[in-house]
Amino acid sequence: MRSVWKGCFYKNNNNGLSKSSTVINTMLKKKFTLHDGKSYKSILIDRSMVGLKIGEFVFTRKMGVLHKKKVLKKKGKK
């Protein structure tokens, strides 16, 4: 939680906002680009996002893929 006397953190980069910036009312209904570590993702800000950090809306982790185990077929006995 940030101190009240410091105010909201806001930093605008060349290509988009930083993930540690706080969403404020002046950003409503605007589209911003955020870097997720691999590419830039665009985000449209709505009223439910006000007061939260911008980084909460971009996934930075790669989702794992679950593989099924291979079942070996046994050869018939003679």
Swiss-Prot record:
Subcellular location: Mitochondrion
Keyword DNA repair included in the entry's annotation: no
Gene Ontology cellular-component terms listed: mitochondrion; ribonucleoprotein complex; ribosome
Gene3D superfamilies referenced in this protein's UniProt entry, alphabetically: 30s Ribosomal Protein S19, Chain A
Pfam families given in the database record: Ribosomal_S19
Protein origin, superkingdom: Eukaryota
Residues annotated as signal peptide: none
Family: Belongs to the universal ribosomal protein uS19 family.
Protein's UniProt name: Small ribosomal subunit protein uS19m
Origin species: Acanthamoeba castellanii
Lineage of the species this protein comes from: Eukaryota, Amoebozoa, Discosea, Longamoebia, Centramoebida
